[in-house]
Amino acid sequence: MKTQKILICLFIGFMFWGNAQDNSKISTMDFVQILNENREEALYYFQNNWKVLREMAINRGYIHSFDVLETPASADAPFELILITTYKNKEQYDAREEHFRELIDEKGELDLMNDKKPGEFRKTLFNKEDVTHWHSLERR
């Protein structure tokens, strides 16, 4: 009986230890408004800068994935784009600033469609950091 209790305690301990060691995915989300009907400039900017940096980051193992979601703007939610960068674990997430600084320095100048600066055609209304992913509707 004592052996069974020890085994049960060890099993439960390993379950909790496994969850503590679980490196669940973490995302950042930027909610972006396109300004002054400059959709072409904004899309060009994100495809040739934001996306390029994320592709570089995937190739280096700095991020897990990225997505761009497009949605119609509304009075309550005046953003058109949601930019999502997902990290495979807390270690990747915690190193994000250092890693993206390295990639930005390597990439060099912004690739813009014309003389318009990013502040003229896009505005990040708000962002969410440290967005955790749920698995099978159970929060980890």
Give the label of every model feature segment.
Residues 1-23:
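Bacterial Sec-dependent N-terminal signal peptides
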Residues 26-59:
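N-terminal targeting signals for Sec/Tat export/insertion, comprising classic cleavable signal peptides
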Residues 54-82:
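Short, glycine- and small/hydrophobic-rich beta-strand elements in well-ordered beta-sheets
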Residues 21-23, 74-79, 125-127:
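Extracellular/periplasmic catalytic domains that process cell-envelope and extracellular macromolecules
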Residues 43, 78-80, 94-98:
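Short, solvent-exposed loop/turn and secondary-structure capping segments
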Residues 19-35, 119, 136-140:
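Sec-dependent signal peptide cleavage junction
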Residues 76, 94-95, 133-140:
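A beta-strand edge to alpha-helix "cap/lid" segment located at domain peripheries
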Residues 52, 56-64, 86-132:
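An amphipathic, aromatic/His-enriched active-site/gating alpha helix that lines ligand/cofactor pockets
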